[in-house]
Amino acid sequence: MKEEYKLSHLKELEAESIHIIREVAAEFENPVMLYSIGKDSSVMVRLAEKAFYPGKVPFPLMHIDSKWKFKEMIQFRDEYAKKYGWNLIVESNMEAFHAGVGPFTHGSKVHTDLMKTQALLRALDKYKFDAAFGGARRDEEKSRAKERIFSFRDKFHQWDPKNQRPELWDIYNARVHKGESIRVFPLSNWTELDIWQYIRLENIPIVPLYYAKERPVVQMDGNLIMADDERLPEKYRDQIEMKMVRFRTLGCWPLTGAVESEADTIEKIVEEMMTTTKSERTTRVIDFDQEGSMEQKKREGYF
């Protein structure tokens, strides 16, 4: 093959993801793209924009707001939704929020179920979405590693890992009965390093929390938790110290550990990723609140 016809590794991944996104737009009546404000979501949104350029993305973005996201995440979401004219839906479980549900009072498992999973399932039912894009990658965590790109959900939005559809080459089965749906993961074959290299290549805006900076953190169960607002319990406040840290993954601030790092530019992050031996999910408290935690959450309808 002539050199000019060869695609780079990133361009191959890009082409595969764009094909998946277009396939969903063609096959489903009412798809939605779940937007978590993180680096993977930012890449997925850019791919969707490319897939339909110069037209507009033909489906909305939806953010499930747990009310415990980092302040910088919400600021970034609102700023860029306005700047790029996104059709953005924001949904929350306000009943649980007003009842005082939170990670410090109820623990990570109950908080995640009520403020994330149940909020998501209600929103999917409310808008009658039949397909939902997610930014999960197979290299993140073992239960995600075995999940199909087109991941079938029954009428209760539940996933059965022992009853998955075969996926041969780039042929995807989009058939569902009324009430059933598909979760679609166009970034399945990307790695964390691929994501960062693509962000650098495309100059994609990301939340500043990904860059190393002096931040107020406290040690909680082996994790460096950033003191993001006044809801930090009193007992931890005198333990706050300033450290040079960044976040490899973003979620609810009491459940997301920072890592000590000097990587304050994209180039330094890419260099750091080339030598790291741990998944970014090792800093997410929700992945370890019970045995087989992520798989159980996904069975129940989690992202």
From Swiss-Prot:
Heterodimer composed of CysD, the smaller subunit, and CysN. GO terms for biological process: hydrogen sulfide biosynthetic process; sulfate assimilation. It comes from the Bacteria. It holds the Pfam family PAPS_reduct. It catalyses: sulfate + ATP + H(+) = adenosine 5'-phosphosulfate + diphosphate. Its EC number is 2.7.7.4. GO terms for molecular function: ATP binding; sulfate adenylyltransferase (ATP) activity. InterPro entries: PAPS_reduct_dom, Rossmann-like_a/b/a_fold, SO4_adenylTrfase_ssu, Sulfate_adenylyltrnsfr_sub2. Keywords: ATP-binding, Nucleotide-binding, Nucleotidyltransferase, Transferase. Belongs to the PAPS reductase family. CysD subfamily. With CysN forms the ATP sulfurylase (ATPS) that catalyzes the adenylation of sulfate producing adenosine 5'-phosphosulfate (APS) and diphosphate, the first enzymatic step in sulfur assimilation pathway. APS synthesis involves the formation of a high-energy phosphoric-sulfuric acid anhydride bond driven by GTP hydrolysis by CysN coupled to ATP hydrolysis by CysD. It is an enzyme of class 2 (transferase). Pathway: Sulfur metabolism; hydrogen sulfide biosynthesis; sulfite from sulfate: step 1/3. This is Sulfate adenylyltransferase subunit 2.
